[in-house]
């Protein structure tokens, strides 16, 4: 009996070691870390840990133990939360939607700005716990009331469930600002990555709601703003740079939007949409809208291939503005509030921010733009990661705080 147990334990150890070595080798063969990225060794370690969790999640999914998103979320939520004595944190629900409310402990009679925060993670990972440190710091340093929304996500809930959850939670919050001591003239929606996309959509959805306090500003941190064109300069230049590599981008898009993975090459070549659609949106998505300095390194303009009709029938949801807020009509975008956009140089989604910035500015919407020359996608999440912390994360937080204080 004991011999059998020892054999099983040894086999498990060898298998675990093999998985770890495979992840490390795969990292060095497939991932590119530019010299200009701050702390490249840290980034390699962070990406290997990230990939190891994804790989084990995939293994457990194949063994039908649990899904990859469930495993990843379980692991990411294991570390205990650190509470700041100057911030009061309250957990409750708007109906079935869990939220965390962060309020400065020092009581005053004056109303404070309110920030509704939607966490990132591609609808796959991320949670109220993973973004607790960000929201707590944002609350304390900007002297604001922060509401973090715990929307439903994969594997059970796909697009547009996360967006609808966040919209419902935001409306609940806007209808009860007095209860939280929030100034109705200073409500901000904010999100990073997938959460940035949600912030953009929520803002657009609320422009025609005169029954609610008007959103004062939106903060979009390396946001996913369109799902049409995956051949922008940044996609070509940065698709092998962690943490958002091409393989994870595909997983995120195909799982959230419920596409068949067989369309990957078709979408890459732009053959998933008809010529008239590309022509219609060229004025907003064309590379001429991106400053020349961002096209100097490894960009090649590629014509879109003829449409694959079967692919178009399945993936046309990318034309929904709840999926691609960047292509909303002018009469909506022109009504949007003051905007703060944060982009990172080493991010495949960088150009989403640049294109939306131009759209907003062309329509007269004030934009504050912060571009992190040494930043990468997901860097803000490292703000509380001790030895894996990147200084760039503090600069992003500082930019957000100054923006909120200036409203």
From Swiss-Prot:
Query: Which residues does the entry assign to the active site, renumbered to this chain?
Result: 193, 347, 377
Sequence motif Involved in the stabilization of the negatively charged intermediate by the formation of the oxyanion hole, residues: 119-121
- Per the UniProt entry, the Enzyme Commission number(s) are 3.1.1.-
Q: Does the keyword Hydrolase apply?
A: yes
Sample GO molecular function, one term: carboxylic ester hydrolase activity
By its UniProt entry, which SUPFAM superfamilies does this protein fall under? alpha/beta-Hydrolases (SSF53474)
Q: Provide the alphabetized UniProt keywords.
A: Hydrolase
Q: Which GO terms describe its cellular component?
A: membrane
InterPro entries xref list: AB_hydrolase_3, AB_hydrolase_fold, Arylacetamide_deacetylase, GDXG_lipolytic_enzyme
Q: Name one Pfam family in it.
A: Abhydrolase_3
State the top-level EC class. hydrolase
Matches recorded under Gene3D superfamilies: alpha/beta hydrolase
PANTHER family, per database record: AB HYDROLASE SUPERFAMILY PROTEIN C4A8.06C, ALPHA_BETA HYDROLASE FOLD-3 DOMAIN-CONTAINING PROTEIN
What the record says about family reads: Belongs to the 'GDXG' lipolytic enzyme family.
Q: What is this protein called?
A: Arylacetamide deacetylase-like 3
Q: Which gene encodes it?
A: AADACL3
């Amino acid at each position: 009996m004991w011999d059998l147990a020892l054999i099983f334990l040894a086999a498990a150890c060898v298998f675990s070691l093999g998985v770890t070595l495979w992840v490390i080798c795969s990292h060095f063969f497939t991932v590119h870390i530019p010299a200009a990225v701050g702390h490249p060794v840290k980034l390699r370690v962070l990406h290997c840990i990230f990939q190891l969790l994804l790989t084990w999640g995939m293994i457990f999914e194949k063994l039908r133990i649990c899904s990859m998103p469930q495993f990843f979320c379980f692991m990411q939520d294991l570390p205990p939360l650190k509470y700041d004595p100057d911030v009061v944190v309250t957990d409750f629900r708007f109906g079935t939607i869990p939220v965390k409310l962060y309020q400065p402990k020092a009581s005053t009679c004056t109303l404070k700005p309110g920030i509704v925060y939607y966490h990132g993670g591609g609808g796959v990972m991320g949670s109220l716990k993973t973004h607790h440190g960000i929201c707590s710091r944002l609350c304390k340093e900007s002297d604001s009331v922060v509401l973090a929304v715990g929307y439903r996500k994969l594997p059970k809930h796909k697009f547009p469930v996360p967006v609808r959850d966040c919209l419902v939670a935001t409306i609940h919050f806007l209808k009860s600002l007095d209860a939280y001591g929030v100034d109705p003239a200073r409500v901000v929606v904010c999100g990073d990555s997938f959460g940035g996309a949600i912030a953009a959509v929520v803002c657009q959805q609320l422009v025609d709601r005169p029954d609610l306090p008007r959103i004062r500003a939106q903060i979009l941190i390396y946001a996913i703003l369109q799902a049409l064109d995956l051949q922008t300069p940044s996609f070509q230049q940065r698709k092998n740079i962690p943490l958002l590599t091409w393989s994870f981008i595909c997983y995120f898009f195909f799982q959230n939007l419920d596409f068949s993975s067989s369309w990957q090459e078709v979408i890459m070549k732009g053959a998933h949409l008809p010529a008239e659609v590309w022509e219609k949106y060229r004025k907003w998505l064309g590379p001429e809208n991106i400053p020349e300095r961002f096209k100097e390194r490894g960009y090649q303009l590629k014509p879109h291939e003829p449409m694959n009709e079967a692919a178009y029938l399945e993936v046309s949801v990318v034309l929904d503005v709840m999926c691609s807020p960047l292509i909303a009509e002018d009469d909506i975008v022109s009504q949007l509030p003051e905007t703060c956009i944060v982009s990172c140089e080493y991010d495949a989604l960088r150009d989403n921010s640049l294109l939306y910035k131009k759209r907003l500015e062309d329509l007269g919407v004030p934009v504050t733009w912060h571009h992190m020359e040494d930043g990468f996608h997901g860097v803000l999440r490292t703000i509380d990661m001790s030895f894996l912390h990147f200084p760039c994360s503090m600069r992003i937080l500082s930019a957000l705080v100054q923006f909120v204080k200036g409203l």
